[in-house]
Amino acid sequence: MLIKWLTLVILLTGSSYLTNAYKILCLFPHVAKSHFVMAEALMQGLAAKGHQVTMISHFPQKNPIPNYRDISLVGSMVEFVNQIPLDMVATGYAHTTVNLLAYLGYVNCENTLEFPAMKEFIAANEKFDLIVTELFNTDCLLGYVYRQNTPFIALSSSSMMPWAHARFGNPNNPSYIGNHFLYHGFEMTFKERVINTLYHEGLEWVYHFVFEKPAYELAKKYFGQSLPPLSEIAKNTSLLLVNTHFSLNRPRPFVPNIVEVGGLHLKPPENKFPEVREN
């Protein structure tokens, strides 16, 4: 009888790792649906694997699935769904786009932190095993990540923002890697390389003073004056998943903790046609 009990204990102990699940928080306050679809696909996949997912976003589920909890930010800002014409994006000036992103990042973060549902969530001080953020136009919510002292990774729903490379020590040579905000082709002319390099250097300054400093002051307001610089917190990002692929975006150097996952949000096609039977 003792042998049977010992055998059962050994089997249960050896298989316990199969039932381990993590509590994962996804902080996704950006209001554009086109950005959210990547995060949603990843979190739904993790929930399907048995992990306990909490999603903070403007897009709560219409058809809830198991292991996936929504904390809705609906009402904190106007959603950017069918609001921005594609021709405006295609013909817009780079500096106009950068200024718009800086403004939206600041306002979005401030409105999120002032939203009652977010205040209640922060006050609860719930603990997680992993936090997922978006690397886009503000690092303001890294103040919350730092206070939680939790490992975190980031998602980039587009090609990497120019200011994202430094935190990973990733090479970003402007002599042959085009800036995200400039519409240069893969093979840049000498003039385009010069413009690309000047814009690359100028954007470092713009990001520090127009994006980073205001976001840092805002983060200190909510997470304490002793908060270290957001740029230092950002360097602890363990992994970045980028929604690009070398077959479409051209090969470029990436350090090991930057991984291209282009098409992550795509689902297998549904077979809507009846099977064709041979006579």
Task: Please report, for each region that a protein language model flagged, where it lies by residue.
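N-terminal signal peptide
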Residues: 2, 10-29, 33, 45-48
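Active-site regions of enzymes building and remodeling cell-envelope glycoconjugates
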Residues: 65-76, 150, 255-264
